[in-house]
Curated annotation (Swiss-Prot):
Pathway as given in its UniProt record: Glycan biosynthesis; glycogen biosynthesis
A GO molecular-function descriptor: glucose-1-phosphate adenylyltransferase activity
Keyword rRNA processing: no
Keyword presence, DNA-binding: no
Binding positions for alpha-D-glucose 1-phosphate per the UniProt entry: 100, 165, 180-181, 191
Keyword annotations: ATP-binding, Carbohydrate metabolism, Glycogen biosynthesis, Glycogen metabolism, Nucleotide-binding, Nucleotidyltransferase, Transferase
Protein name (record): Glucose-1-phosphate adenylyltransferase
Pfam families according to UniProt: Hexapep_GlmU (PF24894), NTP_transferase (PF00483)
Subunit structure: Homotetramer.
PROSITE patterns: ADP_GLC_PYROPHOSPH_1, ADP_GLC_PYROPHOSPH_2, ADP_GLC_PYROPHOSPH_3
Amino acid sequence: MSKKEIIAMILAGGQGSRLGILTRRTAKPAVPFGGKYRIIDFTLSNCSNSGIDTVGVLTQYKPLALNSHIGIGSPWDLDRTSGGVSVLPPYMKETGGNWYKGTANAIYQNRHFIENYDPEYVVILSGDHIYKMNYLEMLDFHKKKNADATIAVFEVPLNEASRFGIMNTDEDDRINEFEEKPKKPKNNLASMGIYIFNWRFLKRFLEEDARDESSNNDFGKNIIPNMLNKKRKLYAYRFNGYWKDVGTIQSLWEANMDLLDDNNSLNIYDPKWKIYSVNPTMPPQYIACNSDVKRSLVVEGCIVLGKVYNSVLFPGVYIGRDTIITNSVIMPNVIVGNNVIIKKSIIGSNARVDDNVIVGTNDNISVVGAGSKVKESIIQ
């Protein structure tokens, strides 16, 4: 294996239990997003656009759809003979195997994969966040600070800071304290779960953590606090762009709706920072003459005979006559019958909604699971 300056390790094994029935059959990073993507596409595209050509994707929970989506990495230009993308499930031994015990244990189990490339730096990423970031700019910051570790942070409203891991820093952005979901936060710099480490430095801490039977083997709970206790040089890298942890139904719906804002800061149309994905071979979308579509994303393969307002339609969606869709996310290959009303809902892939049915209200978000058949109204 050729030596690499930096490689990326993407944590993509999360169950995503807060997404409920949307992750009953698939891992959270493989959940559809934004009309034609899956959530992990943003992290993979960031790697590609940042010039990082060696990526390990650590999978675990129901990985079939995720593994199939990633394939050999062609959409992200990661189908390479040297480096490229590698899917890394938990290791099996002669005596059996276990799931990854925590985020740090996931990296520890795959330390030999990292060693193959003898990197100077490793960037640890989450596969379930929506954002665009140039990791090489973060690496430059890391080098200039002569840091042992650099953690990307995002300013959140102070009244919401208690929901996050908060980094307390000095005037030079050196981290002097980490508080996990503090009741009375001292500032609003939330960890984004994006880390750059000097590999040899991180390896020592991972080995020490693996020997500690009382450890949760987690970066936030164990590795970072241990580094701070030993007075190592950790810095906060402030990120000012769009960032969303889509780990809940509410945040997933909000992130999709954000794309419909004319001035949204994510801007998936930026030709200088494209978001790549596996694009299905489908015919162009068809919008019937008596239909009406406003402020919506409608992608290839869709047939719209009804009305669609402020909604996101994925490939292969069929909207029947006299049907009205508002403020909703309709995932791939959903068939919606005639005279249907869908409000503020997320409809999972391959679901079927029969004629004359009402789904959702303008209050709470209604969710229909993948492959479900809706024969009666759902008003909640």
